[in-house]
């Protein structure tokens, strides 16, 4: 008898943003296969005896290849087990959920997709940036700044895709990405923001114009989301989230920085 695999989106970082359906299937799973960006606290929802498989990918470290992950999901499903594949954000937004679903479908293993809150909308929201706003932004596009294998994305054909651009996986190429967007036609003076570790106590927001970010020496650690467009200008008025985590050794709360000014 075949089991079932749940492809569950874990949300952008705060474990409380997991959906009720996601929590429900986690609490009765036999196996949880989790990514690096899935909040570690969510593993505590799984039964104590559940198998936990680390499938995380980080710079210079890959616990399991995508092919190995697919094999684990198919193998456990064929054994009749309930499996949760726990992914940061949403499984179908740059999460390779489609690849895993195809592998399961091809093997005849039942699966269910449990959507999650994607950083593509949550990161801007936690920085006080609406991706659409009447009179400012009638459209938004979500783009990966980095392709498979770490190759840079071709931003020339996507730079004008929408009023608001949301670029995921941009942390390690921030200056290059901003420079490419300007070269592709985005206004150098357009408001832009980088949101790192969105929704967590370590959240950091850096604001400026595209040109300022392109010329700055600011560094952010992944996961980070770059947002650019007219509605980013609302961040100063709509900022609502106050991270509580202190900067190591300073006792100062992590906050928002402007690349041309001091912390607010």
What is each stretch, according to the model?
Residues 1-15, 20-114, 214, 219, ...:
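Class I S-adenosyl-L-methionine
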Residues 50-57, 108-112, 131-138, 185-194:
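Short hydrophobic/aromatic-enriched beta-strand-loop microsegments
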Residues 34, 87, 115, 144, ...:
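Short beta-strand/turn micro-motifs composed of small residues
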Residues 14, 88-161, 204-207, 253, ...:
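Class I SAM-dependent methyltransferase SAM-binding "motif I" and its flanking Rossmann-like core
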Residues 41-42, 95, 121-122, 176-177:
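Phosphate- and divalent-cation-binding pockets in alpha/beta enzyme and binding domains
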Residues 12, 37-39, 55-62, 117-119, ...:
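Short, acidic/turn-prone active-site loops that include or flank metal/cofactor-
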Residues 2-5, 78-83, 96, 139, ...:
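A contiguous loop/helix-start segment that scaffolds small-molecule binding in enzyme catalytic cores
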Residues 21-23, 46-49, 68-69, 98-102, ...:
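Short, glycine/charged-enriched secondary-structure capping and boundary segments
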